[in-house]
Amino acid sequence: MPKATIVEKTPLFLKAVIEGAYPSLVNSIRRVIISELPVMAIDYVVIVSNTSVMYDEMLAHRLGLVPLTTPLQALPPIEDCETGLVDPSECTVRLMLQINAESDKIVYSGDLVSERPDVVPVYKDIPIVKLVKGQSIILEAYAKLGRAKEHAKWQAALASYYYYPRIKVLDEKCKEECKDICKELTNPFECTFNKAWTCRDICGDRLIVEWDRYKYVFWVESFGNYDVETALREAFRILKKKFSDFITTLTQKAGSLVETKV
């Protein structure tokens, strides 16, 4: 039975030791976190006025990369948005930007005004464009729910893992020789398997480096759209649905083959 032990956790970061799982399962979770978690991101911009030096296309591109808070519990499932089972307006949020510079001014992400208080820029101090006196920007931006497999602006988090290293130091001098690579040679959270193997090249037979095939150090870091716990729960929901859909399709195909044979 797979087991996870949390080593470090903050609202936006989690590190855990996973035991008793196949690499394929751990990697599947990693891939879902990276490319399939749904988040809100600006996808369409209507520019009413832009007298700044920045092209409309570049301005829209910058707005698209501004991370937005995403209250998953208050939004439809991403699958319903993608298949049209819900009204598109339920998966879309409008944001406004109207700035008339009375003096030199930098426009920040925090200047975007959302029609929903729970969908706003995660970080208010992202610079978008600089205006000089007399210049203005008026636009409407429409954010929608999407996934990173379509575009990186919808990426919610990063995730990775490595095999849990088993390190045995036969010569204490190795710790000093490898301190620039691993400050704590025998600490699996400080010294990853790859770093330990680099030390093995330095120390030779004085250092034994092995790994546990079914034990991993796994970490997740959220970009702030939602916390890391929400990211993991959503990743497991999506992965579970993939398994369920696969079994359903396989059962239907198997049933049709039996009927054809009869």
From Swiss-Prot:
Gene3D superfamilies on file: 3.30.70.3110, DNA-directed RNA polymerase, insert domain, RNA polymerase, RBP11-like subunit
**UniProt cross-references to InterPro entries, sorted A to Z:** DNA-dir_RNA_pol_30-40kDasu_CS (IPR001514), DNA-dir_RNA_pol_insert (IPR011262), DNA-dir_RNA_pol_RpoA/D/Rpb3 (IPR011263), RBP11-like (IPR036603), RNAP_Rpo3/Rpb3/RPAC1 (IPR022842), RNApol_insert_sf (IPR036643), Rpo3/RPB3_RNA_Pol_subunit (IPR050518)
Q: Which UniProt keywords apply?
A: Cytoplasm, DNA-directed RNA polymerase, Nucleotidyltransferase, Transcription, Transferase
Q: Which PROSITE patterns match?
A: RNA_POL_D_30KD (PS00446)
Q: Cite a single GO BP annotation.
A: DNA-templated transcription
Subcellular location per UniProt equals:
Cytoplasm
The catalysed reaction is:
RNA(n) + a ribonucleoside 5'-triphosphate = RNA(n+1) + diphosphate
**MF GO annotations:** DNA binding; DNA-directed RNA polymerase activity; protein dimerization activity
In terms of Pfam families, this protein maps to: RNA_pol_A_bac (PF01000), RNA_pol_L (PF01193)
Assigned GO CC terms: cytoplasm; DNA-directed RNA polymerase complex
Enzyme's top EC category: transferase
Subcellular location, principal: cytoplasm
Enzyme Commission designation:
2.7.7.6
Subunit: Part of the RNA polymerase complex.
User: According to its UniProt entry, what is the function of this protein?
Assistant: DNA-dependent RNA polymerase (RNAP) catalyzes the transcription of DNA into RNA using the four ribonucleoside triphosphates as substrates.
Member of which family?
A: Belongs to the archaeal Rpo3/eukaryotic RPB3 RNA polymerase subunit family.
Q: State the HAMAP family in the record.
A: RNApol_arch_Rpo3 (MF_00320)
Q: Which NCBIfam families match?
A: PRK00783.1
Q: What PANTHER family does UniProt report for this protein, alphabetically? A: DNA-DIRECTED RNA POLYMERASE, DNA-DIRECTED RNA POLYMERASE II SUBUNIT RPB3
Name of this chain's protein: DNA-directed RNA polymerase subunit Rpo3
Species of the source: Pyrobaculum islandicum (strain DSM 4184 / JCM 9189 / GEO3)
